Amino acid sequence: MGRRPARCYRQIKNKPYPKSRYCRGVPDPKIRIYDVGMKKKGVDEFSHCVHLVSWEKENVTSEALEAARIACNKYMTKSAGKDAFHLRVRVHPFHVLRINKMLSCAGADRLQTGMRGAFGKPQGTCARVDIGQVLLSVRCKPNNAVHASEALRRAKFKFPGRQKIIESRKWGFTKFSRDEYVRLKSEGRIMPDGVNAKLLGCHGRLSARAPGKAFLSAA
């Protein structure tokens, strides 16, 4: 018997049902890699970021996430080059899907009990996605932003429901806008932290304060 179509599990109806000591025998999710490309490049390398945002409340299977990751990675590698981007899958398939297997052979009514004890066995995993939640993000240089949008457009066909491609105003994966990031960096108030950046706080003794300058906790 083949895999049940994901359209049967698309709507969010029940509470989250994660893998636990009460829910055993869950098959591994199809997606195992969530960061692709130049994931070790610093925060200053890639200033632009493009998001694929879900516009529906639904379940997205691990198979769909893996298919979208492959499609996006393939196009970006071909058009921009494997060193020119960092792709991140932003949702994780923690919700377990169940199936109550039914026999369809002759004399099946003698072997099975129908809907009695119909809780079902684990069949696969999916991610519970809300409206406005980011599914995929690509950070790159400004000249590759068009390629990133096209790569996410191709990845969009792997998902059910509606999605939107949004070009972020933020610097890469950080929470700062591009102008704000450049200003804070020129003031020495930003510390690189991998693909992200830390804002240095303005704390310290009044006696240690230089006139017209903020306190920097790293100083």
Swiss-Prot record:
Keywords: Ribonucleoprotein, Ribosomal protein. Pfam families: Ribosomal_L16. GO terms for molecular function: structural constituent of ribosome. Coiled coil: none annotated. One of its GO terms (biological process) is translation. GO terms for cellular component: ribonucleoprotein complex; ribosome. It comes from the Eukaryota. Component of the small ribosomal subunit. Mature ribosomes consist of a small (40S) and a large (60S) subunit. The 40S subunit contains about 33 different proteins and 1 molecule of RNA (18S). The 60S subunit contains about 49 different proteins and 3 molecules of RNA (25S, 5.8S and 5S). Belongs to the universal ribosomal protein uL16 family. This is Large ribosomal subunit protein uL16y. The gene is SG12.
